[in-house]
Amino acid sequence: MVHPLVDRATSDMLIGPDWAMNLEICDMLNHEPGQTREVVSGIKKRLTSRTSKVQLLALTLLETIITNCGELIHMQVAEKDILHKMVKMAKRKPNIQVKEKILILIDTWQESFSGPQGRHPQYYAAYQELLRAGIVFPQRPQITPSSGQNGPSTRYPQNSRNARQEAIDTSTESEFPTLSLTEIQNARGIMDVLAEMMNAIDGNNKEGLKQEVVVDLVSQCRTYKQRVVHLVNSTSDESMLCQGLALNDDLQRLLAKHEAIASGNSMIKKEEKSKKEVPKDTTQIIDVGSSETKNGSVVAYTTNGPKIDLLSGDDFETPNADNSLALVPLGPPQPSSPVAKPDNSIVLIDMLSDNNCESSTPTSNPHANHQKVQQNYSNGFGPGHQEQSYYGQGSSAPVWNLQITQQPSSPAYGNQPFSPNFSPPASPHYGGQNNNVLALPPPPWEAQSPSSSPQYSPTHPMQVTQVVITTHTHQPLGYNPQGGSPHATNNNNNNMFGMFLPPMTGGHMPPPFGHNGHVTNNNYNPNMYGGYGGQAQPPQQYLVEQQMYGMSLQDNGNNNTNPYQVSSHQPPPMMKPMNKKPEDKLFGDLVELSKFKKPTSGRAGSM
């Protein structure tokens, strides 16, 4: 008699396996091992049924109890000739589903129970009998193992998975053989040919892709791509892996381009052309802070080529070195020291401004490799002589920058020769006499400290003009208030020397004297006669040095009180050379004084 639970689990009324009933039977066998024989006998009887449906349900129940139950079930199945019954059913060509189910179960069991050397060799014997009959076993299905199953149930799923993986690997290797270096090179050659043909095909012409050669090349590239993927996943050689990855990227790019053209999307081809035709950026960036000034011109560094004016053919972006006024540097201010080469450098100042009378003390550049010269001028004759003072003729007009030194007229008189550095004497008188100064005193707002001696470091003077003015008084040198030209003085040798000072109009500087000329002053003080009567005072010379440095004209005289100076950016005066005549220094002090008029104090301060 069949066990009632087995009867219900294998009823022909069921549409499919009743998994709840099957698991209930497994639990019963695990808790009541005495019912194992009765359950196995009932399954054997249900296999002899003529209904294929019942046979399938009986085989499913048998598979479930062997998988989830213990060793007792395995032994009962092997001893009750259930395996022999199943072999007979497979040989009689039953229903295809029943036969396939029997073959799968016998193959799985013989592998799980370790073949002929296992604990139950009956399973392996059944497997060998079917093989001798020429029956081909199907692919093994995957069975999920149970957590409570012992030995055979644990090894069964693992072995089935390994067998399936081996079968998949074998089929893959047969379908995609491993690539070699030669095949990789062949693949690249095919890619090059296909790329050239695709470049020759118009993006809008889809018919060109339907050519037999193109279709064949695309098919080969796709096959190589699959083989490359298999190579990357299976190889352990690093060099082959790198070559495979590079080939895979190239194949992917080429096939994507083919698909884009086939779908009508020719943007890829247009983008490649646009990349080749994009011109360089013509935007120029000029770094004003890092520009260099060379010879008065600004050099701006740009990264692009020059632009040419099509009409004139001139380069209008590159600065011209000859035109230094085109660009003005915006960096730090240029030093006030004179430049070495006045290449078209023009400095404009307001000649009528009152600020021109402000005293300026030029500073030397400590980093320049020039000699630092400091000139302190004095008469050098002891306390009986007074240091000369120089004042301009008014603050509204520009003053000619001069350097006045004091030296004796001739070494033949026994006076001390001229020296560039003398300490100024403290006495303000000539021989103890009080001399009246006709020049205007300095205004209080332009007072300068006596200690601030103007120093100057000459760099590269362009021209040096020296004018020696011989006088007999301490009267400061000034312009002739009467008009354009001063009076010339005739010495004993009848040599005429003079200076031409035209009236200053429009804020322009009058031209200075000739080079190395000696001019005698035409303004004398009546007090000088006492000097000739009381004591013989040697005539005095004032050396006027004018140094022209291209952009500036600086006063380096010894007047520390209040020299009226123009700015360092005053345009240089034009020099007008005169005919040089020899001077008789022996009788230079004998001058006819009746021909000259002394200037009044009221007119001394006006132009």
From Swiss-Prot:
<feature type="modified residue" description="Phosphoserine">
    <location>
        <position position="297"/>
    </location>
</feature>
<comment type="function">
    <text>Might contribute to the loading of the ESCRT machinery.</text>
</comment>
<comment type="similarity">
    <text>Belongs to the TOM1 family.</text>
</comment>
<feature type="modified residue" description="Phosphoserine">
    <location>
        <position position="410"/>
    </location>
</feature>
<feature type="compositionally biased region" description="Polar residues">
    <location>
        <begin position="355"/>
        <end position="379"/>
    </location>
</feature>
<feature type="compositionally biased region" description="Low complexity">
    <location>
        <begin position="448"/>
        <end position="460"/>
    </location>
</feature>
<dbReference type="Pfam" id="PF03127">
    <property type="entry name" value="GAT"/>
</dbReference>
<feature type="region of interest" description="Disordered">
    <location>
        <begin position="355"/>
        <end position="393"/>
    </location>
</feature>
<keyword id="KW-0472">Membrane</keyword>
<keyword id="KW-0813">Transport</keyword>
<feature type="compositionally biased region" description="Polar residues">
    <location>
        <begin position="555"/>
        <end position="569"/>
    </location>
</feature>
<feature type="region of interest" description="Disordered">
    <location>
        <begin position="555"/>
        <end position="582"/>
    </location>
</feature>
<dbReference type="GO" id="GO:0043130">
    <property type="term" value="F:ubiquitin binding"/>
</dbReference>
<dbReference type="GO" id="GO:0043328">
    <property type="term" value="P:protein transport to vacuole involved in ubiquitin-dependent protein catabolic process via the multivesicular body sorting pathway"/>
</dbReference>
<feature type="domain" description="VHS">
    <location>
        <begin position="9"/>
        <end position="138"/>
    </location>
</feature>
<dbReference type="InterPro" id="IPR008942">
    <property type="entry name" value="ENTH_VHS"/>
</dbReference>
<keyword id="KW-0653">Protein transport</keyword>
<dbReference type="GO" id="GO:0035091">
    <property type="term" value="F:phosphatidylinositol binding"/>
</dbReference>
<dbReference type="InterPro" id="IPR004152">
    <property type="entry name" value="GAT_dom"/>
</dbReference>
<dbReference type="GO" id="GO:0005737">
    <property type="term" value="C:cytoplasm"/>
</dbReference>
<protein>
    <recommendedName>
        <fullName>TOM1-like protein 8</fullName>
    </recommendedName>
</protein>
<dbReference type="InterPro" id="IPR002014">
    <property type="entry name" value="VHS_dom"/>
</dbReference>
<feature type="region of interest" description="Disordered">
    <location>
        <begin position="407"/>
        <end position="460"/>
    </location>
</feature>
<feature type="region of interest" description="Disordered">
    <location>
        <begin position="141"/>
        <end position="175"/>
    </location>
</feature>
<dbReference type="Pfam" id="PF00790">
    <property type="entry name" value="VHS"/>
</dbReference>
<dbReference type="GO" id="GO:0016020">
    <property type="term" value="C:membrane"/>
</dbReference>
<dbReference type="InterPro" id="IPR038425">
    <property type="entry name" value="GAT_sf"/>
</dbReference>
<dbReference type="InterPro" id="IPR044836">
    <property type="entry name" value="TOL_plant"/>
</dbReference>
<keyword id="KW-0597">Phosphoprotein</keyword>
<feature type="domain" description="GAT">
    <location>
        <begin position="175"/>
        <end position="263"/>
    </location>
</feature>
